[in-house]
Amino acid sequence: MADYQNILTPCRFAPKPHHGVELPRGNWAEKARPIFVWLLGKIGDASSDHPPGVAGTVSAVLFAFAFLIIGANFLASVDWNPIEFIRLLPWLALEPPRPNWAWVLAPMNEGGWWQITGFFLTMSLLVWWWHVYNRARALGLGTHMAWAFASALFLYLTLGFIRPLLLGNWGEAVPFGLFAHLDWTAAFSLRYGNLYYNPFHMLSIAFLYGSAVLFAMHGATILAVSHLGGDREVEQITDRGTAAERAALFWRWTMG
């Protein structure tokens, strides 16, 4: 029986853990022992073979701090009522300090919690970027994912740090909250002209969603031929008669 499974396979079993690409001696991840998690197996016999490492763990902890602070502030705003928390969740927000506080650390209930949350969230994202970059280098892969993530980080830092820095106060930054950040976006659009008529905004959205669809098409196609070994044909992806070639033919014929 094959020991390779994916998210579409119905059978479940416990094979020996696969350690992946051999890492250089002395690498921290080399000494970690892979573990199997039964609950993760519910979505395709998944296992946490890949240890998060120091950077991944630090990033997760920092993100958890930011997430918990936002959640606690949301709960406090509805007087710690869980029913109201669920009912009003889309409208709840953690707002940045008012403009009069400029760049100083504001009191907790007047934007201080937002500043602390922003610090933890920003550090989490930066450390996770380092994790992605470092893992790619350690495994001998390209760093394309890290630089793609860096472009999203640049937008995040521009709206949450660089632009407020240039304008002189934290009040120009984006609030945390579903409708709150959408309202901020609408106000930003009205302030600087309608973004929907901005050609650069049009191009960025087209490339954003276009690349997302292309990545989804690629991932779904390779997953569909994984039972034929298509996901393991990295070096043979252009050879004739392979599963990856059949997948490529599908899209070639689809596009005429």
Curated annotation (Swiss-Prot):
Residues given in the record as Fe cation binding sites: 218, 233
Cysteines engaged in disulfide bonds, as pairs: none
Membrane topology (UniProt): Multi-pass membrane protein
Signal peptide: none
UniProt keyword Transmembrane present: yes
Highest taxon in the source lineage: Bacteria
Compartments (UniProt record): Cellular chromatophore membrane
A Pfam family reported for this protein in Swiss-Prot or TrEMBL: Photo_RC
Transmembrane annotation, as ranges: 52-78, 110-139, 142-167, 197-225
Record key words, sorted: Bacteriochlorophyll, Chlorophyll, Chromophore, Electron transport, Iron, Magnesium, Membrane, Metal-binding, Photosynthesis, Reaction center, Transmembrane, Transmembrane helix, Transport
Binding annotation for (7R,8Z)-bacteriochlorophyll b: 181, 201
GO terms of molecular function: bacteriochlorophyll binding; electron transporter, transferring electrons within the cyclic electron transport pathway of photosynthesis activity; metal ion binding
Binding site for a ubiquinone: 251
Keyword match Magnesium: yes
GO biological process terms held by the UniProt record: photosynthetic electron transport in photosystem II
GO cellular component terms listed in the entry, alphabetical order: plasma membrane light-harvesting complex; plasma membrane-derived chromatophore membrane
Record's subunit section: Reaction center is composed of four bacteriochlorophylls, two bacteriopheophytins, two ubiquinones, one iron, and two highly hydrophobic polypeptide chains (designated L and M).
Protein purpose: The reaction center is a membrane-bound complex that mediates the initial photochemical event in the electron transfer process of photosynthesis.
UniProt-recorded name of the protein: Reaction center protein M chain
Gene field: pufM
